[in-house]
């Protein structure tokens, strides 16, 4: 397992599940909505078993959408950092160009409402 602390904060536990299910982490494997490797039902059942907390799929969906927006804003920030010359690494350019993926993902969510 990998523990990523850069966005650590107190909040709704459903946010963590939503972040894992954000489209950006599927890396093209859209048939597997959980990080590109699993299904919602399996994630929710495993989470409930391990935590003793009930999963609210609608709250997770909210966090999936907000996670996509949040990642899109971060991608735009990285693109700006690259374009301004403050960080000309290939990593900044590559992540920055992913902002458009989030725009498409958010439009798909809006169409599904």
Task: Name every feature range the model reports, one short phrase each.
Residues 1-15, 19:
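Active-site acidic catalytic loop and adjacent metal/ATP-binding pocket
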Residues 14-52, 66-84:
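Active-site activation/catalytic loop segments of kinase-like enzymes and analogous catalytic loops
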């Amino acid at each position: 397992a990998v523990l990523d602390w850069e966005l650590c904060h107190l909040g709704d536990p459903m946010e963590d599940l939503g972040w894992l299910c954000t489209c950006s982490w599927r890396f093209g494997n859209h048939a597997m909505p959980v990080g590109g490797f699993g299904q919602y039902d399996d994630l929710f059942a495993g989470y409930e078993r391990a935590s003793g907390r009930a999963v609210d799929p609608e709250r997770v969906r909210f966090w999936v959408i907000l996670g996509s927006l949040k990642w899109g804003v971060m991608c735009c920030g990285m693109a700006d950092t690259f374009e301004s010359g403050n960080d000309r690494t290939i990593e900044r350019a590559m992540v920055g160009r992913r902002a458009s993926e989030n725009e498409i993902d958010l439009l798909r969510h809006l169409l599904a409402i």
